[in-house]
């Protein structure tokens, strides 16, 4: 009986355990109408979600996770998505709040979708008068050669026995390479900074930099002196690399000799060679792709010398705010003697802002009182509407977020304006830095130049200008076409990607830019009136045209064979009765007869009237007519005589191609 009872109890225990397991399994099995554990987790989280109408990934329904809205080509391992520029800015589709305005969260969302946020911590520089700055050299800079030529940037003047060799070097390279080759590559330079610059103290947590130098058939000593000066005057901990981009040079000294020479620096200096001539603009974009070690890209022309303590003032603003682009004050290295002097113009301190006229020629205008009021000291960085383009510093990733240079810009010209407008209108800042000085050699007259490759075609610079104004100037582009009417029918390629970039990045209008940043441009270069007519001024039924011969500011115009290429033979007459070429006007000379060309503003030299049907230009103040001597090739005014064929002219439109 005991056996039977024990057996029964054990059987009941087994059955009960089995039934318990069945019940437990049943409770754990999901039913079709049961919410999943993950959905319950989302519900619990959404209770505290400040944006409850957003999806489970924290973004609005249908919104992808953040990806940089930047055109980065995939080159040498640099990850960039060209299609991302087409991505619609999702912030625009956010629900409007009942208050009617954007919340701070919406604003932050838009900014984040446009550019990456600042993550680097950097403290503002501190001015301590009388206490030498922490980046200032404690001892005077040693010379390259004691007592050597050109030390301290003193002029080196060679005798007449070198004249022929100097002229040949200027023709080939644009500089007096005879003198340059006599000067040490490590020469000492003069200090042109304001005294106050010596007492700035900078946070040592500066970003590192890659210095990018593009060259094409550059002279040896001017190129290498650029490199030497950077290495000599840049703290080594911040100099990640120097990247040389050889834009298809064919000079022997820029091949194996260069490769061997840079081995002196054990990999600090690198050279990359383009397989075809790309031009300065696109070669700089290539340089950005090749330079991978530095956090900041510093661009220098291939004939520069950086000055004492140039680095910290230039990079400090970028270390504080990654959307700031900085430009050093550019001094002039004389291409004959290699003396370094401050650039002319500007205000009483030599400070100028970058500007342009409506023909898109580069200009410098004095620093305005408004900009001076924004600074506590005269050596702080100040805002500039534009840069000259050859020398500047920009955070590497920010430059890629901006899309580098417009890939449709060719060789040289206009890229300085394009990057300046893009920075300002899309949320960045462009600052000139008084305490960072860099000397630059300007090409001398007599240089044969570097003609663009055949594949580029004609008028690359003018095409560049047209692309820039079509993308960035909005309604202001009409003023460019008034100044450069020959460009109205010029094909400039596809700019849809660039327009989309503006839209996706919420870039501001050019009107905003002109009113808030470039507010002083029109006071120096007023908006031009509409044209009455434009083109070559040809002697009626002749092959001779009025030609400025490249003269400006008081030179006399002449007659020359018509070439239908515009340039020095392209004029326009506007509704203000000015007969102009670029920013120059025609007027009578001091002798009261010969016609000269000189700089003018809108209130000057309103002297001409063109009677198209009569083929006549009348000089309004004198009542005389425009005349010519086809023997002496002179242009002058004389008493009007309808029977004189030399007073008959025709103005024929010229279109650039």
Swiss-Prot record:
Mn(2+) binds at residues 301, 303, 440. Pathway: Protein modification; protein glycosylation. Widely expressed. Expressed in uterus, retina, kidney, small intestine, omentum, stomach and CNS. Its cofactor is Mn(2+). Residues 206-317 are annotated as: Catalytic subdomain A. Keywords: Disulfide bond, Glycosyltransferase, Golgi apparatus, Lectin, Manganese, Membrane, Metal-binding, Signal-anchor, Transferase, Transmembrane, Transmembrane helix. It comes from the Eukaryota. The keyword Zinc-finger does not apply. The chain crosses the membrane at residues 7-29. There are two conserved domains in the glycosyltransferase region: the N-terminal domain (domain A, also called GT1 motif), which is probably involved in manganese coordination and substrate binding and the C-terminal domain (domain B, also called Gal/GalNAc-T motif), which is probably involved in catalytic reaction and UDP-Gal binding. The ricin B-type lectin domain binds to GalNAc and contributes to the glycopeptide specificity. This is N-acetylgalactosaminyltransferase 7. The gene is GALNT7.
């Amino acid at each position: 009986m005991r056996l039977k009872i024990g057996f029964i109890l054990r059987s009941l225990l087994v059955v009960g355990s089995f039934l318990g397991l069945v019940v437990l399994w049943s409770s754990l099995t999901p039913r079709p109408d049961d919410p999943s554990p993950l959905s319950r987790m989302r519900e619990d989280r959404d209770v505290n979600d400040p944006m409850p109408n957003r999806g489970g990934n924290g973004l609005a329904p249908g919104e992808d996770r953040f990806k940089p809205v930047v055109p980065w080509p995939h080159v040498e391992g640099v990850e960039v998505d060209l299609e991302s520029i087409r991505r619609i800015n999702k912030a625009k589709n956010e629900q409007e709040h009942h208050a009617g305005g954007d919340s701070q969260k919406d604003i932050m969302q838009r900014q984040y979708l446009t550019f990456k946020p600042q993550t680097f911590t950097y403290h503002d520089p501190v001015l301590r008068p009388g206490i030498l700055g922490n980046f200032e050299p404690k001892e005077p800079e040693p010379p390259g050669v004691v007592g050597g030529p050109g030390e301290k940037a003193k002029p080196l003047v060679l005798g007449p026995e070198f004249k022929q060799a100097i002229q040949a070097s200027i023709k080939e390279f644009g500089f007096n390479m005879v003198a340059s080759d006599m000067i040490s590559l490590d020469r000492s330079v003069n200090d042109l900074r304001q005294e106050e610059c010596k007492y700035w103290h900078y946070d040592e947590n500066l970003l590192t930099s890659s210095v990018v130098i593009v060259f094409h058939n550059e002279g040896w000593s001017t190129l290498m002196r650029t490199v030497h000066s950077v290495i000599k005057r840049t703290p080594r901990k911040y100099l990640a690399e120097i990247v040389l981009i050889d834009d298809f040079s064919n000079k022997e000294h820029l091949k194996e000799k260069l490769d061997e020479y840079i081995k002196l620096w054990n990999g600090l200096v690198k050279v990359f060679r383009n397989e075809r001539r790309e031009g300065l603009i696109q070669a700089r974009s290539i340089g950005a792709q090749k330079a991978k070690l530095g956090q900041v890209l510093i661009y220098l022309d291939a004939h520069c010398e950086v000055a004492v303590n140039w680095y910290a003032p230039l990079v400090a603003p970028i270390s504080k705010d990654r959307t700031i682009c900085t430009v050093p004050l550019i001094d002039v290295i004389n291409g004959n003697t290699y003396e370094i002097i401050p650039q002319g113009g500007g205000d009483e301190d030599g400070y100028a802002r970058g500007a342009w006229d409506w023909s898109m020629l580069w200009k410098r205008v004095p620093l305005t009182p408004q900009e001076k009021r924004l600074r506590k000291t005269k050596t702080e960085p100040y805002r500039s509407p534009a840069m000259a383009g050859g020398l500047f510093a920009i955070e590497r990733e920010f430059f890629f977020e901006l899309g580098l240079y417009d890939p449709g810009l060719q060789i040289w010209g206009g890229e300085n304006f394009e990057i300046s407008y893009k920075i300002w209108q899309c949320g960045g800042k462009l600052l000139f830095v008084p305490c960072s000085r860099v000397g630059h050699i300007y090409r001398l007259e007599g240089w044969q130049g570097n003609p663009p490759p055949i594949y580029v075609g004609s008028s690359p610079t003018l095409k560049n200008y047209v692309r820039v104004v079509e993308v960035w100037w909005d309604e202001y582009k009409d003023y460019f076409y008034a100044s450069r009417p020959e460009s109205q029918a010029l094909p400039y390629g596809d700019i849809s990607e660039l327009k989309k970039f503006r839209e996706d990045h919420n870039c501001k209008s050019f009107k905003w830019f002109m009113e808030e940043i470039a507010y002083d441009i029109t006071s120096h270069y007023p908006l031009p009136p509409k044209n009455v007519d434009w083109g070559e001024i040809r002697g009626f039924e002749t092959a001779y045209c009025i030609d400025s011969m490249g003269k400006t500011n008081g030179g006399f115009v002449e007659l020359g064979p018509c070439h239908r290429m515009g340039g020095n033979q392209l004029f326009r007459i506007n509704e203000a009765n000015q007969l102009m070429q670029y920013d120059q006007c025609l007027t009578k000379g001091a002798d009261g007869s010969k016609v000269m060309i000189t700089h003018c503003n809108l209130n000057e030299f309103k002297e001409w009237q063109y009677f198209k049907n009569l083929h006549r230009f009348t000089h309004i103040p004198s009542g005389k007519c425009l005349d010519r001597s086809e023997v002496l090739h002179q242009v002058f005014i004389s008493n009007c005589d309808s029977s004189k064929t030399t007073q008959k002219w025709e103005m024929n439109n010229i279109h650039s191609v």
